[in-house]
Amino acid sequence: MAQIPPSLQDMVNRFNQAQAQLQSVLLRKQQYEAELKEVDKAISEIEKLSPDAKIFKNVGNFLVPQTRDAALQELKERKELLELHVKTLSRQETMLREQLDKLRDEINKELARLKGGEAAKGGG
């Protein structure tokens, strides 16, 4: 093959873009899942404490007192938000994987077509 047709180059470019998007989605999803584990662990530990236990929240360079219930409420809200992010990113991951599969098939078909017609077309 002397030269890649513009249509094939466009497919390859779209494939590479989708692949980069997938990597970004997977990285963000992994970060949210790691934070979700930390939040779950914190909830579990705080639930073991008595209702009047002293809890401190890190705010910048300061530790601020907080009630057990307020801490639990805040963590549960954060957990809900993180779960929503993970769910959204999982959907994006699925869509991108499907898009990549479709583009891979299109690229392979185009390559096979070009390879088969190379002799008849004179290479391009």
UniProtKB/Swiss-Prot annotation:
GO terms for molecular function: protein-folding chaperone binding; unfolded protein binding. CDD domains: Prefoldin_beta_GimC (cd23162). Its main location: cytoplasm. GO terms for biological process: chaperone-mediated protein complex assembly; protein folding. It is found in: Cytoplasm. Keywords: Chaperone, Cytoplasm. GO terms for cellular component: cytoplasm; prefoldin complex. Molecular chaperone capable of stabilizing a range of proteins. Seems to fulfill an ATP-independent, HSP70-like function in archaeal de novo protein folding. Belongs to the prefoldin subunit beta family. Heterohexamer of two alpha and four beta subunits. This is Prefoldin subunit beta. The gene is pfdB.
